[in-house]
């Protein structure tokens, strides 16, 4: 049902003329609140406070918002309605994964957390790319990227079972780091896709290092591996973008 509602919302946003931006905001809110409601139905969920499950709102809402903006800017014509199908189905899978991972002892916890991490990085790429467009004010872009990065970091930190003030402080730190990277990239002639890809690489590097710090297993060789992967990925992205 949630996937169907998201599909209807995305089709309305992408198909109606004149353009109605509020439809995307509404669809993102439905995805987030729907996931929140699904999580609260889990037998292991006992915290009945109003904002207790707010953590589960961020990823599905940002996934819908990012996919809608990306499709709107990247595609034209009849390909738009077809492109709305995969993200709509993905929201159903995200909601299912969020529900199952409420229980840290779930049999498929590791695989589902991996799927949620992939969804988080893809959502980050879609939103970063849209916020890197030349017509978007650089200060607004940096602020929005900080917010997006912080919210997605909170989702990723669930793997370390970190909640509360500690998680919020780490999310703010990661968000500020990626926002600073966005400001640095302003001085380079990058298109939005290349800029978005570089920001995702930075986001992956920051969140990966945070994971290892929280697990108390960050060593020099691990940090070096992340650095090599980040440099190699950035080089591959730049070369590919120049050749295409």
Predicted regions and their residues:
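Perimembrane helix-loop junctions in membrane proteins
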Residues: 43-47, 136, 190, 212-215
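C-terminal transmembrane helix-loop-helix hairpin of multi-pass membrane proteins
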Residues: 1-20, 166-244
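Cytoplasm-facing juxtamembrane segments at the starts of transmembrane helices
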Residues: 1, 47-60, 101-124, 138-144, ...
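N-terminal topogenic module of multi-pass integral membrane proteins
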Residues: 1-106, 219-224, 231-244
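Hydrophobic, membrane-inserted alpha-helices
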Residues: 4-11, 62-68, 120-129, 149-153, ...
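Alpha-helical transmembrane segments in multi-pass membrane proteins
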Residues: 28-32, 59, 63, 120, ...
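Hydrophobic, membrane-facing alpha-helical anchors
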Residues: 27-44, 84-102, 116-128, 139-157, ...
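Membrane-helix interface and helix-disruption motif detector
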Residues: 12-27, 70-85, 129-143, 162-166, ...
